[in-house]
Amino acid sequence: NKHLVFYSENTGFYKYYKTTIEYILSNTNITVHYITSDPNDIVFELAKEQPKLKPYYIGEKKLITLMMKMDADVVVMTMPDLENFHIKRSYVRKDIEYIYVQHGVGSTNSLLRKGAQDHYDTVFCTGPSQEREIRQMEELDNTPRKNLVEVGYPLLDEMLEAYESKAVKVNETKQILIAPSWQKDNIVDSCLEKLLDSL
């Protein structure tokens, strides 16, 4: 009777599901089955207050078998590379709808391996740029078209609400945030020392 299953690698990933799960629990009679590989996942505390949220812990060694034997209507994950490495689609049910939830608003082509979303049926996109990228990659790689659903990025909405709810504090001394990318020739590799010396 596990119609809807979410899988989380650890407690840090709940934030990507939070808004969706809360909406489902508040507006439907669907039970959310939440599988986590973190025995200390926050979901165990949340489930104490929410009877339709059913958390389960599964260790890494049993995860592969669980995924191969998955029997659900819908499986939602933030883990890219379904089918590409150790996590496979169910061998038991071929009609499961697998949904990928993005970790951020950036370019999926820059942040994920080639083919990382190819074996998902549906991808929740944060905006039209991700939709365009995915469609272009499907065309270039001749892969099946996925259902693309523009859902925004609720985590950013929550951060904005939290910021706007606080009193504005103006620092007398300006603060500079340096946020390098992961790409080759990023600011840390190319000019960090010169930048710091000038400050």
At which residue positions do the language-model features occur?
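Active-site and donor-binding regions of nucleotide-sugar-utilizing enzymes
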Residues: V5-E161
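Conserved catalytic-core segment of nucleotide-activated headgroup transferases in glycan assembly
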Residues: F13-N29, P154-L199
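Non-catalytic membrane-proximal stalk/linker segments that position and tether the catalytic domains
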Residues: N1-K2
